[in-house]
Amino acid sequence: MRAPLCLLLLVAHAVDMLALNRRKKQVGTGLGGNCTGCIICSEENGCSTCQQRLFLFIRREGIRQYGKCLHDCPPGYFGIRGQEVNRCKKCGATCESCFSQDFCIRCKRQFYLYKGKCLPTCPPGTLAHQNTRECQGECELGPWGGWSPCTHNGKTCGSAWGLESRVREAGRAGHEEAATCQVLSESRKCPIQRPCPGERSPGQKKGRKDRRPRKDRKLDRRLDVRPRQPGLQP
């Protein structure tokens, strides 16, 4: 009877030791391994509760997730402090790093940072800095250029009125590290030389008769009467 009883006691002791070791793994005190900084930790899922002031970062790999306690959230995440646990949350899709969900610090490629937002292009009046990916400062606009030739449908003649325009470019548009600022332009109405060179004026048509008053035409005919030569019969 003693042998089976001793064997039963040994099995019970082994089960107790196994349960104790499992509890030790699940309750970490920050002494090392993947449970550093954890209050509750499991071998399968890592940390689920962190020590005070630390942030819980959940890394997802497929359907599995693994928790880790960090002093600072990794790039692409920002920290939110809560009553029970501090968590790391992912930044917006266009942010490389952020201060909060609505305020980016650095943008991903093809986007520019402007007042905490990541935009595909910088707004008018700002310069796009290619190295920092930021929209910086106000554009320094240069003076207005000269007026263009007055044209109508691409021609400088043949019409009564046309349009002329001028532009005002940014003073720093040639900066190597900056994109061109928005160019300002304005147009105004202008008179055009109505007949083009070599063309008849609109009032002159081919084969048009003399439209002077009849009495003037008769006077010209009277003045054009030539004296008859002697010996010629009428």
From Swiss-Prot:
Location of region: Disordered: 190-234
Location(s), subcellular: Secreted
Positions of FU repeats: 85-128
GO molecular function ontology, one term from the record: signaling receptor binding
Keywords of this entry: Disease variant, Disulfide bond, Glycoprotein, Heparin-binding, Phosphoprotein, Secreted, Sensory transduction, Signal, Wnt signaling pathway
Signal peptide as annotated in the record: 1-19
GO annotation (BP), single: positive regulation of canonical Wnt signaling pathway
Annotated glycosylation sites: 34
Compositionally biased tracts (Basic and acidic residues): 217-227
Disulfide bonds: 35-41, 38-47, 50-69, 73-88, 91-98, 95-104, 107-118, 122-135, 139-181, 150-157, 190-196
Keyword Disulfide bond applies: yes
Biological role: Activator of the canonical Wnt signaling pathway by acting as a ligand for LGR4-6 receptors. Upon binding to LGR4-6 (LGR4, LGR5 or LGR6), LGR4-6 associate with phosphorylated LRP6 and frizzled receptors that are activated by extracellular Wnt receptors, triggering the canonical Wnt signaling pathway to increase expression of target genes. Also regulates the canonical Wnt/beta-catenin-dependent pathway and non-canonical Wnt signaling by acting as an inhibitor of ZNRF3, an important regulator of the Wnt signaling pathway.
Family to which this protein belongs: Belongs to the R-spondin family.
Protein name: R-spondin-4
Originating organism: Homo sapiens
Phylogenetic placement of the source organism: Eukaryota, Metazoa, Chordata, Craniata, Vertebrata
